[in-house]
Regions:
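Composition- and surface-driven signal marking solvent-exposed, interaction-prone regions
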Residues: 26-29, 71-75, 92-96, 126-127, ...
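Mid-domain catalytic core of redox enzymes
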Residues: 1-71
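Charged, low-complexity, helix-prone segments enriched in Lys/Glu/Asp/Gln
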Residues: 1, 44, 99-106, 136-140
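A glycine-rich dinucleotide-binding beta-alpha-beta segment and adjacent secondary-structure elements
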Residues: 54-60, 116-183
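C-terminal structured subdomain/cap of oxidoreductase catalytic cores
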Residues: 1-3, 7-21, 74-76, 82, ...
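Glycine-rich, aromatic-lined ligand/substrate-binding cores of catalytic
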Residues: 55, 67-92, 96-110
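Flexible loop/turn segments at secondary-structure boundaries
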Residues: 20-23, 66-68, 85-88, 133-136, ...
């Protein structure tokens, strides 16, 4: 059977009518990882329609890092969560109306979750948009919008060592110099694979 890929991200992009100074009252650092999953949370349950009200949401403010990432007196905020593989029939099974409804529902649930850290967040929103795993697939060409190459699910392990790098292919002089050369992938996997490729070529 085909190897499973890692879960994709759902990301909400917000433009806020709130200064960086005011935002920093709630977010002491630009990147916040609250660990507050609710009962019933299961990253492997693709049929849970209420998944986004149970998951933890990370927050990142680009404008707290660089104020030029928002107009003066305003701020930018990203909310992000890993999503079960092919959630809700892969976001509506190709039906654009269902896709839009699921996207809006997920967006509102994540904004509600972030409001526990930033009270009244909804009232400050001037702009909002979101990216689903299908969005990431369209722009990155990663299968199913995979966030870090292959699945991190320990039950779907296919490399002997999750941290090992395998750049070899059946094709002579063709090597894998990307995150796909390691089970857990990501930036560390891509760097390790590129390093191994350079060593092999030299």
């Amino acid at each position: 059977s085909a190897a499973a890929v890692s879960e994709g991200f759902f990301t909400v992009y917000l433009g806020l009518n709130m200064s960086n100074q005011e935002l920093s009252r709630y977010m002491k650092v630009p990147h916040v990882f609250p660990l507050d999953v609710q009962p019933g949370y299961d990253i492997y349950n693709s049929e849970d329609a209420d998944f986004f009200s149970k998951t933890t949401v990370s927050l990142y403010s680009p404008s707290m890092v660089n104020p030029r990432h928002a107009p003066e007196g305003k701020s930018s905020l990203m909310l992000q969560a890993l999503v079960p593989y092919h959630w809700m029939n892969n976001w509506g099974g190709g039906d654009k109306e269902i896709y839009a409804t699921l996207k809006e529902k997920a967006m509102e649930a994540m904004i509600d979750s972030a409001s526990r850290l930033i009270p009244g967040l909804q009232e400050y929103i001037e702009y909002k948009d979101a990216a689903t795993p299908l969005t990431y697939e369209r722009y990155t060409h990663n299968s199913d919008g995979a966030s870090s190459a292959w699945s991190w699910n320990p039950k779907k392990k296919f490399y002997n060592n999750l941290m090992s790098v395998n750049i070899e292919t059946p094709v002579k002089n063709l090597y894998i110099g990307s995150c796909w050369a390691m089970q857990i992938g990501g930036v560390p996997g891509a760097l390790a694979a590129a390093y191994q490729c350079v060593k092999k070529i030299n």
